[in-house]
Amino acid sequence: MNVGRTVKVTQAVVDLKFEGELPRIFNALKSKLEYRGKELILEVSQHIGDNIVRCIAMDSTNGVSRNDEFVDTGAPISVPVGRSTLGRIFNVVGEVIDECGPLKGKYDLESIHRVPPSFTEQKIQEEVLVTGIKVIDLLAPYLKGGKIGLFGGAGVGKTVLIMELINNIAKAHKGFSVFAGVGERTREGNDLYHEMITSNVINVNEHEKSQAVLVYGQMNEPPGARARVALTALTMAEYFRDHENQDVLFFVDNIFRFTQAGSEISALLGRMPSAVGYQPTLATDMGAMQERIASTTSGSITSVQAIYVPADDLTDPAPAATFSHLDSTTVLSRQIAEMGIYPAVDPLDSTSQSLSAEIVGEEHYKVTSEVKRILQTYKSLQDIIAILGMDELSDEDKITVDRARKIQKFFSQPFHVAEVFTGMPGKFVSLSDTVSSFKGIVEGEYDHLPEAAFYMVGNIDEAIKKAELIKDETKVGAKS
């Protein structure tokens, strides 16, 4: 048994001295004593000479003192994988934390540090993943097996959008989802769990019938947990892909906190900071995780990653490091959120590599191009409208502005997960309905309908019904 003794504790970093063989980098070390009723797990990060290893703690180091003993497990942190993990909540070291008893059934243990699939194993799929959210399916469609980034500042709706995506995709595609809560609010993690129970994504009585696994390392936890929890969740997703031949959905909320935790650890390990105080290994850390999110001949992992943008600055090194790995970007705009349009997706900033006639089809591509042209024209006319008003525009421009406003309003959509707050039932809109509805708007088929009819509805038929209701209400108001 290889035992090390504590020589120094600096917040989440612990130095241990080993008399015998040094444990390898990434090996897990277990405490002999219990702290706050449980063992403390450390991960070896550096060999710093004189038989001393520097480790990152996966939980609080409160109570750890000099000469406390830690045992080398001889392997990296290993977590449970397999169908028995479905419907359960785990922490970074693979312990269940949902108070539903120990893990039942068969499961394997896998290391959280794994090698990405080789080039020969990887496979590119060109199939669109329908989300049921109009603005995404039309303007920035997601590819099966792709990497999607949800960019947005604080409070513009990233978490709600992720919750809706989990809900819609679980119901429509019946695939397994793995959710990594990285450094976000504990309340949101709790809300998501109960929302999944309500929508039958998680079955608390028969866990094996569930379709999701939750792995949490929330913002009250030390940086070690926040830096590794995404890898724990990814390991579980990889098992479903490789051994169950599943098309898995991997959600991360929030990838910025993964970078932030790495930055905290880097400072505690004594590394020289890089641009804006981030760790010098930012690109390496990000690449090591992102390269594991891949589609193979066995199955696929489609990842949706919420990315907090500090001070709404997309050039910040943390979001910028993520950009190069993504296939689609969904940018959430504060200006659109202030207009009351939810989801607050910016239609001109959001992009997708799958938006080509070969993948989405000729009609979809043409409708999207026309929608973007109308919105871009409207954007360029806004200064003129602000200074001179609508009356100074040409008749053609007036029609363009009218259609652009209807398109903007029609991008809004009631969400299933927000029914409690909005009082409106959620809508899942099929891709064919989305394309045909927007085609009708850009071709002027619905020019006679009022702008308000397009707000917070599903397909175009609902907008027509809403227009009739508005007309009837106007008549009643006029009579009274």
Swiss-Prot record:
The lineage of its organism: Bacteria, Pseudomonadati, Pseudomonadota, Alphaproteobacteria, Rickettsiales. It is a peripheral membrane protein. Its EC number is 7.1.2.2. F-type ATPases have 2 components, CF(1) - the catalytic core - and CF(0) - the membrane proton channel. CF(1) has five subunits: alpha(3), beta(3), gamma(1), delta(1), epsilon(1). CF(0) has three main subunits: a(1), b(2) and c(9-12). The alpha and beta chains form an alternating ring which encloses part of the gamma chain. CF(1) is attached to CF(0) by a central stalk formed by the gamma and epsilon chains, while a peripheral stalk is formed by the delta and b chains. It is found in: Cell membrane. InterPro entries: AAA+_ATPase, ATP-synt_VA_C, ATP_synth_F1_bsu, ATPase_a/bsu_AS, ATPase_alpha/beta_chains, ATPase_F1/V1/A1_a/bsu_N, ATPase_F1/V1/A1_a/bsu_N_sf, ATPase_F1/V1/A1_a/bsu_nucl-bd. It catalyses: ATP + H2O + 4 H(+)(in) = ADP + phosphate + 5 H(+)(out). The gene is atpD. It comes from the Bacteria. This is ATP synthase subunit beta. Keywords: ATP synthesis, ATP-binding, Cell membrane, CF(1), Hydrogen ion transport, Ion transport, Membrane, Nucleotide-binding, Translocase, Transport. SUPFAM superfamilies: C-terminal domain of alpha and beta subunits of F1 ATP synthase (SSF47917), N-terminal domain of alpha and beta subunits of F1 ATP synthase (SSF50615), P-loop containing nucleoside triphosphate hydrolases (SSF52540).
